[in-house]
């Protein structure tokens, strides 16, 4: 939870109510706890076992994705949080590559995400990592809804792959330039 709280504080500092909105925050936390309990959340560790981040997967969010999206063809990624200390190191890109590899191994064509509709910087980040905007949904009870997907065959960091062994923490491999 500390990573989540830290992320909420960082977002609040830049003027965003993402993840701390009083109307949607408690539902989001409950959903995240369910991902953890169901074994659909991974912790990202460095070689010293320091926590660098976390990521979850889950079923298609039916507030956004529907049958015409061919739900079964995608891996749905949620709650990618990178610690402040690890921000800007490329770990997010490694995790997205990992998710693409898992999706491909499962025979899925897409890695799909949704993010806050007003998080334009985050949307540009994902587009820079190979995601294409599919559409934006705006149900009245949600503030997320910017939907994007990336082909599961898209691997941007082939020399720094994370292990796809399920149930294990995601360990970041050391490199000469850890900031790469």
Language model regions located:
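Conserved GNAT-fold acetyl-CoA-binding loop/helix
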Residues: 5-31
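Conserved beta-strand-loop-alpha-helix junction that forms the acyl-donor binding cleft
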Residues: 113-123, 139-144
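A short helix-loop-beta-strand connector motif used in the catalytic cores of GNAT acetyltransferases and
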Residues: 27-43, 76
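Conserved acetyl-CoA-binding loop-helix of GNAT-fold acetyltransferases
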Residues: 82, 88-101, 124-128
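Conserved acetyl-CoA-binding loop of GNAT-fold acetyltransferases
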Residues: 126-136
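Conserved acyl-donor/pantetheine-binding loop and adjacent beta-alpha core of acyl/acetyltransferases
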Residues: 54-83, 87
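Conserved beta-hairpin
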Residues: 38-55
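Conserved GNAT acetyl-CoA-binding A-motif
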Residues: 96, 103-115
């Amino acid at each position: 939870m500390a990573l989540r709280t830290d992320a909420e504080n960082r977002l609040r500092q830049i003027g965003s109510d993402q993840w701390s909105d009083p109307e949607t925050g408690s539902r989001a936390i409950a959903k995240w706890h369910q991902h953890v309990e169901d074994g659909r959340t991974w912790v990202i560790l460095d070689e010293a076992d320091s926590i660098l981040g976390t990521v979850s997967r889950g079923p298609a969010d039916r507030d956004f994705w529907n049958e015409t999206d061919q739900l079964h063809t995608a891996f749905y990624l949620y709650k990618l949080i990178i610690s402040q200390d690890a921000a800007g190191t490329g770990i997010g890109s490694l995790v997205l590559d990992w998710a693409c590899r898992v999706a491909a191994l499962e025979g899925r064509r897409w890695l799909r995400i949704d993010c806050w509709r007003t998080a334009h910087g985050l949307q540009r980040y994902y587009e820079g990592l190979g995601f294409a905007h599919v559409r934006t949904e705006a149900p009245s009870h949600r503030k997320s809804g910017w939907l994007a997907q990336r082909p599961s065959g898209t691997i941007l960091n082939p020399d720094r792959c994370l292990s796809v062994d399920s149930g294990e923490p995601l360990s970041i491999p050391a490199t000469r330039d850890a900031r790469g």
